[in-house]
UniProtKB/Swiss-Prot annotation:
Name of the molecule in the record: Protein translocase subunit SecF
Gene Ontology terms: cellular component: plasma membrane
InterPro entries in the record: SecD/SecF_arch_bac, SecD/SecF_bac, SecD_SecF_C, SecD_SecF_C_bact, SecF_bac
GO MF annotation: an example: protein-transporting ATPase activity
Domain of life: Bacteria
Job description of the protein: Part of the Sec protein translocase complex. Interacts with the SecYEG preprotein conducting channel. SecDF uses the proton motive force (PMF) to complete protein translocation after the ATP-dependent function of SecA.
Lineage of origin: Bacteria, Pseudomonadati, Spirochaetota, Spirochaetia, Spirochaetales
Gene that this sequence comes from: secF
Length: 299
């Protein structure tokens, strides 16, 4: 007979520890770092797409040229149909952006590249994004995450009950706040990759939670002689091996990406690994105890 662990009794302690870590992380972020490290995707910037008539130039070569000149710089390779050319998107972050600054940056970049590679340089596209537009992108990203929460609430309410939906949402809120605190404490640059990581974590954590909730729902119908507390603990025990195995295999796969990559992909994999750990324990120790408290109160 499978051993049944009383997971619910640990719920309050786990929630308190998580809440303290999140609170300390947020305080540290705003009072020590002065806020978050917003990446170029969400900052005022100059963007220049260009082509160099020379093959096999690497991103790091471009970064080494301009890192002493520009404090915040991002370089990405663009696929070129011409194998004799190398194409790049170069973004320079600045607090003050206008047409004159864009012209100055473009001239500096072209001059330096011609001097370094002794090749023809063609500007494919160039533009600047001011602070008002970058602020709009931040707000839209926040609304994107909130919209995801609303869709999750509707989906789980239709599939299960409102109590299940609220427990899932609160559990995911915990996961996101934990990740947000983690990003702030370690000064990880928040860019489009990190937003994708957060949305992926939401989906992963939700999947873990739904697996447990689905078993709880089935056992409520089947184990009619048991209290809901017993049903909850039995259900978590029955799905625990699957939950842990899925988390471990996912973590190992993402860890390999973290080891063998650099830049934004490395940050993405780091955040996702933290999300896997947090999402796993929150689905067991936070979502289920919350459901226990809500089950009799909300149908």
């Amino acid at each position: 007979m499978q051993r049944v662990i009383n997971f619910s009794k640990y719920g309050s302690n786990v929630l308190i520890v998580s809440a303290v870590l999140i609170l300390v992380g947020l305080i540290y972020t705003f009072f020590y770092h002065g806020g978050y490290n917003w990446g170029i995707d969400f900052s005022s910037r100059v963007n220049i797409n260009l082509s160099i008539e020379k093959s096999n130039i690497k991103e790091n070569e471009i970064k080494k040229i301009f890192s002493p000149i520009y404090k915040t710089l991002d370089v990405n390779s663009i696929f070129s149909p011409d194998q004799n050319k190398s194409e790049f998107s170069i973004m320079v972050k600045s607090d003050v952006i206008d047409y004159a600054f864009k012209t100055e940056v473009q001239k500096t970049i072209l001059d330096k590249l011609k001097e370094t590679f002794d090749a023809n340089i063609e500007v494919l596209d160039s533009y600047f994004i001011d602070s008002s537009f970058s602020s709009t992108l931040r707000i839209r990203s926040i609304f994107l995450v909130l919209g995801t929460f609303i869709l999750i609430l509707i989906y789980i309410t239709l599939r299960f009950k409102l109590s299940y939906a609220i427990a899932s949402i609160l559990s995911i809120f915990h996961d996101i706040f934990f990740i947000v605190a983690f990003l702030g404490v370690f000064r990880i640059e928040i860019n489009s990759y990190i937003i994708v990581a957060i949305l992926t974590i939401i989906g992963y954590s939700l999947n873990d939670t739904i697996i447990i909730f689905d078993r709880i729902r089935d056992n409520v119908k089947r184990l009619t002689d048991n209290t809901f507390l017993n049903v909850l603990n039995i259900s978590i025990s029955q799905t625990l091996s699957r939950t842990v195995l899925t988390s471990v295999t996912t973590f190992v796969a993402v860890f390999s990406i973290y080891v063998f990559t650099e830049g934004s992909i490395k940050d993405f994999s780091l955040v996702f690994m933290v999300g896997v750990i947090v999402g796993t324990y929150s689905s067991v120790f936070i979502a289920s105890p919350i459901l226990l408290n809500l089950y009799k109160k909300i149908k």
